[in-house]
Curated annotation (Swiss-Prot):
Protein name: Large ribosomal subunit protein bL33
Keywords assigned by UniProt, alphabetized: Ribonucleoprotein, Ribosomal protein
PROSITE patterns attached to this UniProt entry: RIBOSOMAL_L33 (PS00582)
Protein's gene: rpmG
Family matches, as NCBIfam families: PRK00595.1 (NF001860), rpmG_bact (TIGR01023)
Gene Ontology CC terms: cytosolic large ribosomal subunit
Species of the source: Novosphingobium aromaticivorans (strain ATCC 700278 / DSM 12444 / CCUG 56034 / CIP 105152 / NBRC 16084 / F199)
Any Pfam family matching the protein: Ribosomal_L33
GO terms (BP aspect): translation
Top-level taxonomic group: Bacteria
Length: 55
């Protein structure tokens, strides 16, 4: 089988709550780090989430 083109990444909350989302990204098309504004249920607000490696 061929190697998959997408890799799994973590989107970690910048509110330092430890909450994260897991999503996929194609590193050939999206070379820079992803940032999204998503909901953090720990602080109950929308905050910025930044890309981090899955350990």
């Amino acid at each position: 089988m061929a190697k998959p083109t997408t890799v799994k990444i973590r989107l970690v909350s910048t509110a330092d709550t430890g909450f994260f989302y897991v999503t996929k990204k194609n590193p050939r098309n999206t070379t820079e780090k992803m940032t999204f504004r998503k909901y953090d249920p720990v602080v109950r607000k929308h905050v910025e989430f930044k890309e981090a490696k899955i350990k």
